[in-house]
């Protein structure tokens, strides 16, 4: 067990898996920041509008991304089991699942654009709503392309080849930034420019990932696209609970975002900017969470539960080290970092406080709340993670947000306190699940 030659993943193999994932996570966040920072030159109304739409998009995108995660778990376990043929068959089935869900939500977003925005954010200023509508219409068209990319990227990660999705993400982000420069600074079409850049980059990502899948010798995607109910059932076993968890979680975030919107533009902008900046601290931990699917999934597929626990502990230590190394400098330089967004004095004051608070909480509990949960999913323990996440979200993130933010008058600060209460509950319950060994209860559900 302790000899490296007997381990499924050497130290070098873990580094080769993790570094591309960290870079890709950075690039994904950079794309969102590029939209926000470059759109900031058009005014706070555009920034707020994009932020509100992004909250909806995260909900819709999260549903078909959950299908991709389900496929990734199944593919990783088959890879660990040494069955490459089943890896290929699983690939076909989850492309069908991801593609179908992505098309469905594109249609929903296009048809009910105004209705959704009015229902959720009917009390925002008119210029914010106008920017949100424009951005939403255009970005919705990109959903199927993003679904294709997410599906292909998840497959490459599941078999341990994370460099592919990193390279595609790099090219796509360069296209996005160039598009922003031309359409926002040059043509000056504000929210539409940011949305069009995102659309073009996602189309390119989808085309590139399809071409690379065709050339891959690790993933043999079949030309037969008939539904295989047995394999699809395994994907849905992971994907549906994950999707329900993700969607209900995002609904909760939408409710809190809607609550924040009622606190005024300063609170809305501070929330958007803090979320954007704070996400950089979470990059390594999020990347490790993605790697958990590959590493723990392959260990479980190979029947190596002791190795699964060993790698889980090892990767959590790395996640915490990264959180601390990034969090401390972000606290020290919080004000100059926030200064790049050209915020008003009132918004700046709120944003700096929220950023420092977020950094401290991330260093304490974030990896246990999120990265660790992917280990449970990779082992097939998806129902427990779903129940914990949904219950904690409603009780803490939503319930306490209204009590602290609105009831006690703490505003957006109260909402962030409630959010971190959610993190603490998740961290405690997931850690206890692993400590008792119950997370391995469904380890034979997928490949045996």
Task: Please describe what each predicted stretch is.
Residues 44-55, 132, 136, 195, ...:
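Small-residue hotspots at the loop-to-helix junctions and early N-terminal turns
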Residues 30-48, 117-126, 182-189, 247-276, ...:
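Helix-terminus/linker motif at the lipid-water interface of multi-pass membrane proteins
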């Amino acid at each position: 067990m302790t000899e490296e030659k007997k381990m499924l993943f050497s130290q070098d193999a873990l580094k080769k898996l993790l570094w591309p994932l960290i870079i890709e996570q950075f690039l994904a966040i950079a794309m969102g920041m590029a939209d926000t920072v470059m759109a900031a030159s058009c005014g706070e109304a555009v920034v707020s509008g994009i932020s509100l739409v992004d909250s909806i998009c995260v909900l819709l995108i999260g549903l078909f991304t959950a299908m991709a995660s389900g496929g990734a778990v199944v593919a990783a376990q088959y890879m660990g089991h040494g069955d490459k043929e089943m890896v290929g068959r699983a690939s076909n089935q989850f492309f069908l699942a991801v593609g179908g869900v992505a098309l469905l939500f594109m249609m929903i977003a296009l048809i009910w654009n105004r209705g959704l925005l009015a229902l959720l954010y009917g009390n925002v200023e008119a210029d914010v709503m106008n920017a949100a509508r424009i951005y939403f219409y255009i970005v919705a068209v990109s959903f199927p392309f993003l679904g294709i990319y997410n599906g292909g990227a998840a497959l490459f990660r599941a078999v341990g080849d994370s460099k592919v999705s990193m390279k595609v993400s790099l090219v796509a982000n360069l296209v996005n930034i160039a598009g922003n420069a031309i359409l926002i600074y040059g043509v000056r079409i504000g929210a539409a420019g940011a949305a069009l850049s995102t659309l073009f980059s996602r189309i390119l990502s989808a085309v590139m990932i399809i071409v690379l899948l065709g050339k891959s010798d690790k993933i043999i995607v079949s030309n037969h696209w008939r539904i295989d109910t047995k394999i699809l059932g395994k994907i849905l076993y992971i994907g549906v609970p994950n999707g329900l968890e993700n969607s209900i979680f995002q609904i909760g975030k939408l409710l809190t975002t809607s609550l924040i919107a009622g606190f005024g533009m300063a609170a809305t902008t501070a929330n958007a900017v803090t979320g954007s900046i704070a996400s950089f601290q979470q990059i390594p931990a999020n990347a490790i969470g993605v790697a958990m699917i590959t590493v723990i999934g392959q260990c479980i597929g190979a029947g190596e539960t002791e190795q699964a626990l060993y790698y889980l502990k090892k990767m959590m230590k790395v996640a915490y080290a990264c959180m601390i190394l990034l969090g401390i400098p972000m606290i020290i330089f919080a004000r100059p970092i926030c200064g790049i967004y050209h915020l008003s004095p009132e918004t700046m004051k709120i944003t700096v406080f929220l950023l420092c608070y977020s950094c401290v909480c991330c260093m304490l509990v974030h990896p246990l709340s999120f990265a660790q949960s992917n280990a449970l999913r990779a082992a097939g323990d998806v129902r427990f993670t779903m129940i914990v996440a949904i219950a904690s979200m409603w009780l803490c993130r939503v319930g306490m947000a209204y009590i602290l933010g609105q009831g006690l008058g703490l505003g957006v600060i109260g909402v962030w306190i409630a959010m971190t209460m959610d993190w603490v509950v998740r961290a405690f319950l997931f850690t206890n699940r692993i400590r008792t060994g119950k997370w391995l209860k469904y380890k034979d559900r997928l490949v045996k």
